Every structure is written in C-alpha cells, then in structure tokens.
Amino acid sequence: MAFNFNWSPLMADASFYTRAQDLLTAALNKSPKPPIIVDDIIVTELNLGSIPPELEILEIGDLAEDRFRGIFKMSYSGDAFLTLKTRVQANPLNTYLLTRPSFASPLPLAAATPLTIPLQITLSDFKLSGFVILVFSKQKGITVVFRNDPLESLKVSSTFDSIPFVRDFLQREIEAQLRILFMDELPAIIHRLSLRLWVPEYRAGEEDQDQNTNTAGEGPGQDPLASPPQDPVDALGNALNESEIASLSLDSSVETHSLFSQKNLLRLAALTDSQRTLSLFTPSIQEVVYRAWTSPSDQGDISGGVTSPLSPALSRTQSQVGGMSSFQDNASTISSYSRTSTSTHTFSTYGLNLGAGRHSKAHARKRKKRVVDLRRPKQPESETASVTDESSFTETTSAPSVRSAPLPRVNEQPDDPVTPPLSPDSDFHLPPIPERHRFSISRPALRRDIATEMLRETGESSSEPARRHAEVDDIDATPRTIIRHEPSRYEGEKQEAGPSRQLPSTILPFTEEKSTPGPVDQALVERIAGEIARRMREDKLMGTNSCAFWNRPGHEESPPPAYGQ
C-alpha cells in the first residue's frame, strides 16, 4: 500500500508558516535557556522545503473515512531550514558569576562587565530517522508521537563560525535543545496546527481569545488616584488634606508621593520588624534585612533608639533562663526552707560551699581505725577515754550529712528558772568530740553531744573515786557516768525550783534504774530535756533542707563557751 503526499499546498500557505513560527518561538522559550543566552529566542524564518519525508507503513490499527491510526518509519533528508535570532553574552566571566552565589565570588568591577552580542543562527540539512505513531481524526486532529530520538544530524550556521570554540559550543547546545523539541514540543505543535486546519470551533475560539487579548492591552491605564484611601499620608508619614490630594495626578509634573493607608503602613512596619534581629543594641541600617526583630507591642520599652515613621521603635526583650533559681538577699524568706529542685542545691550560696572539700564523695566514708598503737608512751586516763569516745562515735556514724557547718549555740532561757553557779576549774575535763565526727553523726550521737555540751556549760567537777566508780559501771565510757554520779550540793536550790516534770522518752538512754536519782541529777536531767525539746522544735522548723541553717529567722550566733572553764 502506498500513499501520495501533496507537499506543495503546505509550502504555499503563508498563514500556516506564521502560526508555526509563533508556536516554535513559544516552545523554544518555554524550557530553561543556558546562561549564555540573555534574550528570547525568536524564529524569524521557517521553510519546510520542497522534498517531502519518506514514510514506510509498518502497522495499521484503525482505518475509516474520518480516522486513521498507524505506525510508520520516517526518514527525512530535505532542504528545510529554520532561522533563529537572539542575544548572547560574550563575557564568560559574567556568565560564570551569574551562576555562582554572590558571597562566593570576588565581585570584580570591570572584568565582569556584561557584553551582549546579537546572534543569528540558521539550522539546515536536517537528517531525521525514527518510528512514528500517527493518529488522524477530523474531530481531534493529528497526533504524532516519536518512539525514539529522530534527530541524527543538522547543520548550525551562526555569526561566530569564524571562532571554532563558539561554533562547537553552539552546535552542541542547539542539538540538545532540538532533541527535547522533537520529543516533547513538536507533537503538541503539530496537534494544535491540525486542529486549526480541520476543526472550525477551535479556530473560532482562538480568534476570540486573540481579540480579547488585544482589547485588554489597549486603552488608557487605570488611575490609582481616582479613589484615594480614607486616611492618606505622604512618603514621610504626614497626613494629607483633600486639597493636596486633588492637586495630585498621574500627569502632574510635580513628584507624586505614594499614598498608603495608615493601617496598611502599620501592618507593613510589623511585617518588616518581624524579620529583624532580636539583639538589644542592633542599629537600624538602611538596605539591610534583619533576621527577626521584636513585636511592635513592645515599642515603649526602649528609651532611646533609631525610629522611623514607618516602623515602631526597637524594644528591649528580657530573656530568662528557666530552671535556674535566683539568689535572694533576704534570709528570712519562708520559701527557702523547702527544697524546690535539684538545681537549687547546685547553685548554693557561698557559705554552704566552705566545707565542700571535706565532704566530697571520695571522703564520704572514712576508714575506721580501731587498732591502738601500743608502742606509744602510755596516755593518761582522760586521753584514753577520749580515744574510746572517738571510736564509739565513729561506729555509730551513718551516711554523710549535707551540713557543712556545726549548729550554732543559741543563748536561750532554760526551762529551769534556777541556774546553778559554775564550779571552779578542775583538772579533769570532758573529752571534746572531733569536728569531723560531730558533723557526720546521726541522731543518737547528736543527743550524746547535747548532754556533753550541757555538762561542759555547767563545768561541775567530781572526785576521783566517783570517776573510777563510773568507769566500772558504764562500759561505753560516755559522759553518762558523770551525769549519774554528780555531787548533791544543789539540793536546796532544786527544792526551791519546784516539783520536777515527767521526763520524755528521749531521756531514757541517759537514766538507769539501778542508780539512785538525787536532786542534782533531776536538775541536770530537766535541763537536758529542755535543751533536747528545744532543738527538736528547731529541727522540725528547719526540716531536712541543707540551706535551713543559713536561713533561720531571728537567730544570732554566739561564740561557743570556753573549754577551759
């Protein structure tokens, strides 16, 4: 089966070429152009030539009077040509810098000056070969689809043929663009041309669209001053009167100020401020876009700053760090008695950090040394008792406490109104408790310390046989021996003080059933009971907070009593 194509009517129709040139121009400018081309590509001349393409029928799928579908093998080596006109950039440095970010370029002044040269390109000697799927319908036009890349070669002639480098570059670029044109744009162009030829409705719709486009482009422009805003202002933000608005026009020789609503100016100012910085002391620099700025609601917070009539003043925002407790100078704040969080103890005051070195985790538990070096010279009984007391207190030591300073001794009136006089100095003194053990002892050891302090304040002395008898009775060699064997020389004073109160359960470790309580013993026991009750009340007030010692209200420290009394 053979077909006879009438190629001459297509060459004679001038309107067909005009429409084809417009479609080709739109198709060439649709895809992204290389940076060297700085202007639109315009098709100035198009000629299909006198030699038709050769078609070989491979398959016919549908055949009727008004429709046809088949697969062809096409080959073309004719005299068709195409002429294009555009402008190119002759300075390669300018092209290079346009494709790079500004911060990565040296920004030359004269070397990157653009130099555009008009360029005319003629494409001829097309050689095409490929498989084409052709679908023809009078209602839907012609649809052509290339199953492969049909372009084999073509000849590119330009004004830069004398420069081999530019000629080869243009050859490669144009071939790449034409391959895209044949595969994507040419089928759409052929389909639109066929609709214009065989479908009258499509032709009438295109004519109406062209008329509407021409009508919209003609006529005088709209005057934006015909309906001015309600509250117009000039470029400096000053309000304009009606007479000043009437004097303004588009054709006026006087410089026309842009009229904006005050509400819109505030919105634009807020939008501009939102892109500025959050820095407190960043000046307002012209032609500089900041990242962010504070909101216009905070414009009254700053006293001095760079302001403009179009934007509110820069406000100062106070930033706070969450989770960190601030220090207060008032030591009597009630909230300081409670433990808020871990960060409160992390950022402690200076006083609590004085003993942090000796209460570190590396020295939390001191090794207990119960071995006595017998090679040393023999010590007196008082020193031996001191060693025994030290070891006994070490054995009752619990986990290290968080307190870094001893509790202060407060001068307070005791429960007993009668205070016995201090006894004269004696050669025997109670052994002092080392500071490191007194800081870290538990509750029972603290009560022993209270009894020792009370006896140290009274400073009473006893006879040597009584001390030996106390050492035999009491194995622990604690100050309880002296409590049970005090001389009864304050009997008369105790009777004047009144009947004794019932002892609390906390004093039971200091008493013994087999000992006969005397008047002096009752007086000391009552004093010790009152001291223990007072300290228990203070402990309940202070709680377990390590900062409670420094925040106790209404207490003044007094120096400890002299140990030599």
Curated annotation (Swiss-Prot):
**Membrane topology field:** Multi-pass membrane protein
Q: Quaternary state and partners of this protein?
A: Component of the ER-mitochondria encounter structure (ERMES) or MDM complex, composed of mmm1, mdm10, mdm12 and mdm34.
- Name the protein family: Belongs to the MDM34 family.
Q: Segment Disordered: which positions?
A: 207-236, 296-317, 348-504
Q: Where is the composition biased (Basic residues)?
A: 358-370
Query: What name does the UniProt record give this protein?
Result: Mitochondrial distribution and morphology protein 34
Q: Which PROSITE patterns match?
A: SMP
Q: Which UniProt keywords apply?
A: Lipid transport, Lipid-binding, Membrane, Mitochondrion, Mitochondrion outer membrane, Transmembrane, Transmembrane beta strand, Transport
Q: Which HAMAP family match?
A: Mdm34 (MF_03105)
Q: Organism source for this protein?
A: Aspergillus terreus (strain NIH 2624 / FGSC A1156)
> What's one GO-annotated cellular component?
ERMES complex
Subcellular location(s): the record lists: Mitochondrion outer membrane
Record function comment: Component of the ERMES/MDM complex, which serves as a molecular tether to connect the endoplasmic reticulum (ER) and mitochondria. Components of this complex are involved in the control of mitochondrial shape and protein biogenesis, and function in nonvesicular lipid trafficking between the ER and mitochondria. Mdm34 is required for the interaction of the ER-resident membrane protein mmm1 and the outer mitochondrial membrane-resident beta-barrel protein mdm10.
Q: Name one GO molecular function term.
A: lipid binding
- Polar residues composition bias: residue spans: 382-401
